[in-house]
């Protein structure tokens, strides 16, 4: 797909629309104990000239044991107290990635120039 870039991202990283994700903490192979859930994200950015849609789907061995959801942005008006320490991802109010939502039959919007992610 022309104008589409993506990268695997840790489930611990927040994918903000205006900042390329670092990819820190990504493992080549995921492991878990029996009964544990493991997750990762697929961060993507569409650089096309207009909004498009994609219809992601899982394939391969074990696909019936996995699911894919989109990470939606939610408003955050007061991200931190003015007298807080420096260990925050951002100090600005805005739209933050937080809500996991099932993908409808309409697919996922590709918004030009913004990083977004899928949660697997």
What kind of feature is each model-predicted range?
Residues 2-24, 48-119:
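Surface-exposed binding patches on compact interaction domains or structured appendages
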């Amino acid at each position: 797909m022309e104008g589409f870039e993506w990268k695997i991202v840790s489930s611990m990283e927040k994918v903000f629309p205006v900042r390329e994700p670092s990819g820190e903490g990504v493992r080549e192979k995921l492991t878990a104990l029996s009964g544990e859930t493991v997750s990762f994200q697929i961060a993507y950015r569409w650089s096309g000239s207009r909004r498009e849609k994609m219809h992601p789907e899982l394939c391969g061995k074990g696909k019936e044991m996995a699911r894919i959801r989109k990470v939606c942005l939610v408003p955050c008006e007061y991200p931190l107290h003015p007298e807080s320490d420096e260990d925050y991802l951002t100090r600005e109010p805005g739209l933050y990635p937080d809500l996991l939502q099932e993908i409808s039959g309409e697919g996922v919007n590709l918004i030009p120039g913004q990083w977004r992610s899928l949660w697997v």
